[in-house]
């Protein structure tokens, strides 16, 4: 019962509160388990060489700790996926571009030299969770395998992408991972209401292309993002870029309204907002060009977006909830 004074003793102990950043909602456990199970299914596809690239947009919940929820995150699916891949004999590079520091994943592998964690984020001086400073670099034998790149508020595309090229790329090349896991939070976008970084679609996609150019088995996860339109656009474009599809500037009119949601009867409007970056942020970003290809992937990669049906068919949710070795410490 979490209703009394905003939280109960038990709920507060595990990080839940009706007043905080981990509110309890109906079927919360089921939803969190489905998201985490999808990531585990994606990791299984990568580990077994069934797919080269997998994108679970519902994943990337990087703040959760072994014993409590944190920062809207119930289970830390990136950490669990990394552990699964480690148990499969893989070395993993985890790169987190969410505006918030990926503290939960870093802490999970802080003393492990088989996992390279890199987080580019708004400095903890200004933003939750208040961590992710450059001196957080790991414990033996993992010293140097935790890398943090805290950025000042209002950092834009040019500095962000140049920093990525100068710091992230050499580290990944030197580490030589078997698998790349990325957390693609979109709250670094310039219109996000909770953060202060100033990335545009161009900068975000430049980083996605740099990930793609690494030519590694790639498990991409979602993450934060509180401008819903920006999240939808960036992840759609990332999806296309991962599989070699060029998407058009404009959403086809027959796809604007979504079947099965409360937007069915909403009027279709084009709200135009002039931004400080000098372009119109109305879903028709002039930075993007090209026409939609309908013949499928041209990248040569096998690709999957795991859905609930495939997830349950694989029975990974029961494995995830009842396998003690997989859940140890989480």
What are these regions (language model features)?
Residues 5-330:
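A general "terminal functional-core" signal
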């Amino acid at each position: 019962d979490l209703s009394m004074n905003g939280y109960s003793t038990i709920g507060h102990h595990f990080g839940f509160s009706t007043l905080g950043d981990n509110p309890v909602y109906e079927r919360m456990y089921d939803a969190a388990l489905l998201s985490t199970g999808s990531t585990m299914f994606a990791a299984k596809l990568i580990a077994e060489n069934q797919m080269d690239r997998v994108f679970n947009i519902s994943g990337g919940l990087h703040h959760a700790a072994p014993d409590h929820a944190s920062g809207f995150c119930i289970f830390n699916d990136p950490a669990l996926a990394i552990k699964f891949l480690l148990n499969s004999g893989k070395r993993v590079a985890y790169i987190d571009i969410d505006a918030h520091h990926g503290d939960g994943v870093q802490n999970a592998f802080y003393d492990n030299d088989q996992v390279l964690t890199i987080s580019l984020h708004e400095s903890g001086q200004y933003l939750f969770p208040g961590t992710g400073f450059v001196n957080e670099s790991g414990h033996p034998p993992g010293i140097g395998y935790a890398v943090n790149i805290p950025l000042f508020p209002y950092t834009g595309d040019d500095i962000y992408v140049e920093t990525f090229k100068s710091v992230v790329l050499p580290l990944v090349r030197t580490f030589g991972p078997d698998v790349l896991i990325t957390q693609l939070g979109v709250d670094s976008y310039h219109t996000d209401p909770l953060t202060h970084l100033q990335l545009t679609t161009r900068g975000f996609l430049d980083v996605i292309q740099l990930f793609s150019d690494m030519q590694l088995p790639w498990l991409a996860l979602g993450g934060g993002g509180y401008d819903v339109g920006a999240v939808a656009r960036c992840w759609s474009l990332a999806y296309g870029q991962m599989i070699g599809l060029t998407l058009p500037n404009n959403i086809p009119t027959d796809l604007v309204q979504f079947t099965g949601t409360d937007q069915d009867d909403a009027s279709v409007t084009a709200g135009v907002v002039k931004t400080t970056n000098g372009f119109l942020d109305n879903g028709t970003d002039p930075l993007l060009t090209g026409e939609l290809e309908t013949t499928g992937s041209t990248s040569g990669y096998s690709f999957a977006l795991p859905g609930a049906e495939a997830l349950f068919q694989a029975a990974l949710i029961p494995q995830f909830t009842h396998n003690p070795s997989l859940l140890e410490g989480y």
